[in-house]
Amino acid sequence: MAKGKIVQVIGPVVDIEFPAEELPSILNAITIKGKSGDIDINLTVEVMQHLGDGITRCIAMSSTDGLTRGMEAVDTGSPIKVPVGEETLGRVFNVLGQTVDHNPAPVGNKEFWPIHRPAPKFDEQETSTQILETGIKVVDLIAPYSRGGKIGLFGGAGVGKTVLIMELIHNIATQHGGYSVFSGVGERTREGNDLWSEMTESGVINKTALVYGQMNEPPGARMRVALTGLTMAEYFRDVQHQDVLLFIDNIFRFIQAGSEVSALLGRMPSAVGYQPTLTTDVGALQERITSTKKGSITSVQAVYVPADDLTDPGPAATFTHLDATTVLSRQIAELGIYPAVDPLDSTSRILDPHVIGEDHYEVARGVQAVLQKYKELQDIIAILGMEELSDADKLTVARARKIQRFLSQPFFVAEQFTGSPGKYVPLKETIRGFKEILEGKYDDLPESAFYMVGSIDEAVEAAKKIKQEA
């Protein structure tokens, strides 16, 4: 293993000189161990540039406090390697694959994979498009997820992103037997801790590996932590032939960290100060998330949109890769309808009769048409009241309100808060329920019967109870 010495430290950027014939490759991990006063230093840096004269410019994965010129650095001969396999489940890791949950390190972990890996070749990829059933009515009906697809999750603070993420993890684990990997990229440490606590309480932690690189970490760690999580997910896909869920919260912070690193390396910025390699960086990550003939990685990515500007180069680079968008709406959350998914704003590439079938497509578009009409009538209702509407419009409003309530659903992971047992609704049942509402089969039932139930049969039962109590 080649040894070099530090010649310059500027914040998270470390320049290391190696013998010219032993220069480490780009993306290799280099370890620096030593003591500086009372501080024990154990730092990993990643090679980013060769400056000539045997000097490599590296980016640190943790704090560079205490580093001095002349300290010894050792080339590991490979990129950062992280543990993979079932031993990672139920644990919290950092970007280097070290456990940070204060429990003993995983015992018997045999395999370590490098975080920089090629994307699957064309001939390895699955060509057919299949729907991934989530058991969440509004998602399966309006904006269905494709197996091995990429989904953007948009929503402000407090509208239920985390609960939706945990429900997806729960349903994939129980119904598909699949594992999940959660990459926390550049978000609040408190949120990461809350997620871990909630997962532990709801019991989904044993099917999940958590990888965190929070906003207090140097940009190198935030830029690479998504790749650490992705590598763990790739093992479950390629070796265990699983259908894996990969959550990235937040994909924008990955781009932001890349832009910080780019500036630190002295590259000329492009539009709005982003790195010139923006589309390459995003593409290198997204192309590895796909279905192969062995298994699939379906990715749900929370997308922060700076200043709500969808044309910003950061989010715009992400949108080109997404197959579906799930938009959470504060207005719907205020009505008490959870999950607060906006059925008119959420989209999916596979909402196409050739992929999901004519029946599903017709029902989904029918539901959207009724809700859109209701939205248009709301101003009239607010000013003139329901009495001024025509009979046809009154019927549309009544059905729309039933549909709106029927899009709500009790979640398994929220059982201890709501007191209602969670419901997994198969896709066939979801389509049947909404189809029958659109056909007018339940026009005589009270709309409250449709709120927070699973299948349509439960709504009918709830209506009977309401009638008896009245």
UniProtKB/Swiss-Prot annotation:
The residues that hold ATP are G155, G156, A157, G158, V159, G160, K161, T162
Which GO MF term does the entry hold, naming one?
Answer: ATP hydrolysis activity
Q: Gene3D superfamilies, from UniProt?
A: 2.40.10.170, Bovine Mitochondrial F1-atpase, Atp Synthase Beta Chain, Chain D, domain 3, P-loop containing nucleotide triphosphate hydrolases
Q: How does it sit in the membrane?
A: Peripheral membrane protein
Q: Quick one: signal sequence residues?
A: none
Catalyses which reaction(s):
ATP + H2O + 4 H(+)(in) = ADP + phosphate + 5 H(+)(out)
EC assignment: the record states 7.1.2.2
Ordered alphabetically, the record's keywords are: ATP synthesis, ATP-binding, Cell membrane, CF(1), Hydrogen ion transport, Ion transport, Membrane, Nucleotide-binding, Translocase, Transport
Instruction: Please state where this protein is localized.
Output: Cell membrane
Query: Where is it found, in Gene Ontology cellular component terms?
Result: plasma membrane; proton-transporting ATP synthase complex
A Pfam family: ATP-synt_ab
> By its UniProt entry, which InterPro entries does this protein fall under?
AAA+_ATPase, ATP-synt_VA_C, ATP_synth_F1_bsu, ATPase_a/bsu_AS, ATPase_alpha/beta_chains, ATPase_F1/V1/A1_a/bsu_N, ATPase_F1/V1/A1_a/bsu_N_sf, ATPase_F1/V1/A1_a/bsu_nucl-bd
Listed under subunit, the entry gives: F-type ATPases have 2 components, CF(1) - the catalytic core - and CF(0) - the membrane proton channel. CF(1) has five subunits: alpha(3), beta(3), gamma(1), delta(1), epsilon(1). CF(0) has three main subunits: a(1), b(2) and c(9-12). The alpha and beta chains form an alternating ring which encloses part of the gamma chain. CF(1) is attached to CF(0) by a central stalk formed by the gamma and epsilon chains, while a peripheral stalk is formed by the delta and b chains.
- Family to which this protein belongs: Belongs to the ATPase alpha/beta chains family.
Purpose: Produces ATP from ADP in the presence of a proton gradient across the membrane. The catalytic sites are hosted primarily by the beta subunits.
- What's this protein's name? ATP synthase subunit beta
The encoding gene: atpD
